[in-house]
Amino acid sequence: MPASRLFTRDFTLMTVGQIISLFGNAILRFALSLHVLALTGSAAVFGGILALSMVPTALLSPLGGILADRMPRARIMVILDFSTCACILVFDALFARSGNLAAVTLFMVLLSLIQAVYQPSVQASVPTLVAEERLTAANGVVLQVQALTGLLGPVLGGI
């Protein structure tokens, strides 16, 4: 019996989508934080807004997991990616050049809320996309993508 492949079409599509989504969010969130720092000159405001924007992900990820268990995960991920895109377009059109700190904070919190549901949906999808004997490797790939975006996203956002 031949060994199953880790990088099936569906797993590859999900992973590429995750890379694009997570890198985009990490770059954007860090760049917005730097924008706040440039506007205010205050490291305290910079850190406060960045910390506040992480709270929804920390608190609501378990609820995102429940939602991912009860709804079609692929649909959740697609809806959330389009929601992120819509939020970016609205923010850019209305507030990007205004220097409105409340709008920046709200936008960053919205991105964090989306992430609180998106990431559990990705993780819950893995067992349905790969064979059981490849599950550990597939989970490793997903976690590696998360780690790399967390590390490299801010670097790219600072450029």
What annotation goes with each model-predicted range?
Residues 1-159:
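Alpha-helical transmembrane-bundle signature of multi-pass membrane transport and export proteins
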